[in-house]
Swiss-Prot record:
GO terms for cellular component: cytoplasm. AMP binds at T31, R36, Q57, L58, V59, G85, F86, P87, R88, Q92, R160, R171. The keyword NADP does not apply. Consists of three domains, a large central CORE domain and two small peripheral domains, NMPbind and LID, which undergo movements during catalysis. The LID domain closes over the site of phosphoryl transfer upon ATP binding. Assembling and dissambling the active center during each catalytic cycle provides an effective means to prevent ATP hydrolysis. Some bacteria have evolved a zinc-coordinating structure that stabilizes the LID domain. Zn(2+) binds at C130, C133, C150, C153. InterPro entries: Adenyl_kin_sub (IPR006259), Adenylat/UMP-CMP_kin (IPR000850), Adenylat_kinase_CS (IPR033690), Adenylate_kinase_lid-dom (IPR007862), P-loop_NTPase (IPR027417). Pathway: Purine metabolism; AMP biosynthesis via salvage pathway; AMP from ADP: step 1/1. Catalyzes the reversible transfer of the terminal phosphate group between ATP and AMP. Plays an important role in cellular energy homeostasis and in adenine nucleotide metabolism. This is Adenylate kinase. Pfam families: ADK, ADK_lid. SUPFAM superfamilies: P-loop containing nucleoside triphosphate hydrolases.
Amino acid sequence: MKIILLGPPGAGKGTQAKFISEEYSIPHISTGDIFRKNISDKTPLGIEAKEYLDKGQLVPDEVTINIVKDRLSEDDCESGFLLDGFPRTVYQAEALDSFLNANDNKIDMVLLIDVPRELIFDRMTGRRICPSCGASYHVKFNPPKLKDKCDICNNDIIQRKDDTESTVKDRLDVYEKQTEPLINYYKKQGVISTIEGSGEINQVFQRAKSALGAVCK
């Protein structure tokens, strides 16, 4: 089964991707993970990607397509995969379709996680992280016991650059402008299914399983 997850930043795609990957025994392929590794290793790709990500912008198509193709060519993708973070533009989607078609494959379902913009904004701007131990918090949904202090190591928790109000607004604007046309692209192919992304994590997962059941019979 070959699946794509779509949805705005902060919609919980990464969390649902892990659940789906485990449920259906397919690899979870996150372009975010690929970029983070390159950024950590300070590769040319990582340096270039970081410049865009720090501004809340999407990484250009040409930087991402070949690395995704290489990943999809690995043995563990023969029985299927779940793409999280790719494609983000119609151009990327067309490149993916061409690659899959050349190998007699196709996308089985595009799962769109739909969350209101206002909720996304609250989710993202409220996130905090401990720079020392990596523990994560949320000022509204998962606050630390002591304000601005990590429960684990007692160091100050911080807001990442990606989670500031201005950056979140920019990221959502970029998503709406560049990514949402994918919805129409996949609607024309008849492979898109939309689920409500609000509520408890397990509730969203049950909705995802119900939608995916149509291609798992």
